[in-house]
Amino acid sequence: MKPYTQTTGLVAPLDRANVDTDQIIPKQFLKSIKRTGFGPNLFDEWRYLDVGQPGQDNSKRPLNPDFVLNQPRYQGASVLLARENFGCGSSREHAPWALDEYGFRTVIAPSYADIFFNNSFKNGLLPIILAEAEVDELFRQVEANEGYQLSIDLAAQTVTRPDGKVLGFEVDPFRKHCLLNGLDDIGLTLQDADAIRAFEGGYRQQQPWLFR
C-alpha cells in the first residue's frame, strides 16, 4: 500500500448526497478479486451514456459530457469532494479500489457509511470528515475557481485552501499510523513475521503429530 503523507491536488466536486457503492462501482464489475482494473468503471452509470459490461473497451464508449469527471477542468483530480453519507449501500472493497485506481487519494465529505469509511483506510484512501458548512464553502470555491487545489497534510491533520485558510480534521491514531507508513493488514502482519516463524517452529516441536 502506498504511504500517504502530504499531497496537493486538484479537487473534483461530486455534488450528490447518499452516493452508494453500486454507483461508485456497479455490481457487474465485481467478479474480479484483483485490486486493479476498476478505475475505468468508476461511477460507470453516470460517466458513460451506454450500459457498461465487463471486458468492454472503455475508450470506445460514449461519455456523458455533463458528468463532473468528464469535464476538462477536472481532469487529473486527486481529491474528491462529496456530500453526506458517501459510500453507503452494500459492502465492497472494490469501491475504494476503483477510486484509488482512477487517481483519487482523498475524499472529503461531511459523513460516510461506516463500512466504506473503514475499507478506505485499509486500501490507502484517506476519507476526511469536515463540517457541513466547511464542505458547502469548498463546493462554492471549487465551482467558482477553475484549477482549485487543496493541500492535505496527514501528519498535521490539516486541509489548506488556496487562500491560506487551514481546516483541521480528526483521524484515529492507529489508522493515521498505517496510512503514513503504507501498512495494510498484510503489511501489519509481516511486521511480526519473525515472531510468527518463531512461534510456528516452537509449536511444531511441541506438537509434531499435527504436522505429519
Swiss-Prot record:
A cellular-component GO term for this protein: 3-isopropylmalate dehydratase complex
UniProt KW keywords: Amino-acid biosynthesis, Branched-chain amino acid biosynthesis, Leucine biosynthesis, Lyase
Gene of this entry: leuD
Protein name as catalogued: 3-isopropylmalate dehydratase small subunit
GO molecular function, one term: 3-isopropylmalate dehydratase activity
Reaction equations catalysed: (2R,3S)-3-isopropylmalate = (2S)-2-isopropylmalate
Claim: Amino-acid biosynthesis is one of the keywords in the record: yes
EC code: 4.2.1.33
A Pfam family annotated for this UniProt entry: Aconitase_C
CDD domains, per database record: IPMI_Swivel
Pathway: Amino-acid biosynthesis; L-leucine biosynthesis; L-leucine from 3-methyl-2-oxobutanoate: step 2/4
SUPFAM superfamilies named in the record: LeuD/IlvD-like
BP-aspect Gene Ontology terms: L-leucine biosynthetic process
Family: Belongs to the LeuD family. LeuD type 1 subfamily.
Matching InterPro entries: 3-IsopropMal_deHydase_ssu, Aconitase/3IPM_dehydase_swvl, AconitaseA/IPMdHydase_ssu_swvl, IPMI_Swivel, LeuD
Gene3D superfamilies named in the record: Aconitase, domain 4
Subunit structure: Heterodimer of LeuC and LeuD.
